[in-house]
Swiss-Prot record:
Keywords: Tumor antigen. Residues 1-69, 82-103 are annotated as: Disordered. May negatively regulates apoptosis. Residues 30-44, 82-100 have a biased composition (Polar residues). The lineage of its organism: Eukaryota, Metazoa, Chordata, Craniata, Vertebrata. The keyword Cell cycle does not apply. Residues 1-14 have a biased composition (Basic and acidic residues). InterPro entries: MAGE_N. One of its GO terms (biological process) is regulation of chromosome segregation. It comes from Homo sapiens (Human). This is Putative melanoma-associated antigen 5P. Expressed in many tumors of several types, such as melanoma, head and neck squamous cell carcinoma, lung carcinoma and breast carcinoma, but not in normal tissues except for testes.
Length: 124
């Protein structure tokens, strides 16, 4: 086999690697979408409230090691989040009758992330 034939023989494999990487990214994106759908379907939301209803067996309000309540931090975060929501609502055109499902999901996800960060800050 000549050098030229070897180099041509290697080129299709490079194309396969690129295709596999592209398919891998698509697979990751599909898995992420499926996970987001699973989270949104498993998180019970109560219309008209800012947060979620805790699932049965979930821990109650977070406490610091000294026993003090985490309410001041939660209030600060809630006020900050409301100010952000207020500014984004001013940008919307016209009233909407029902909340966008994506925005509901994002709000629930933001709350969970904030709770996790708060918990980790208290723990470590």
């Amino acid at each position: 086999m000549s050098l030229e034939q070897k180099s041509q023989h290697c080129k299709p494999e490079e194309g396969l690697d690129t295709q596999e990487e592209a398919l891998g990214l698509v697979g990751v994106q599909a898995a992420t979408t499926e996970e987001q759908e699973a989270v949104s379907s498993s998180s019970p939301l109560v219309p008209g409230t800012l947060g979620e209803v805790p699932a049965a067996g979930s821990p109650g309000p977070l406490k610091s090691p000294q026993g003090a309540s985490a309410i001041p931090t939660a209030i600060d975060f809630t006020l900050w989040r409301q100010s952000i929501k207020g500014s984004s609502n001013q940008e919307e055109e016209g009233p909407s009758t029902s909340p966008d499902p994506e925005s509901v999901f994002r709000a629930a996800l933001s709350k969970k992330v904030a709770d996790l960060i708060h918990f980790l800050l208290l723990k470590y």
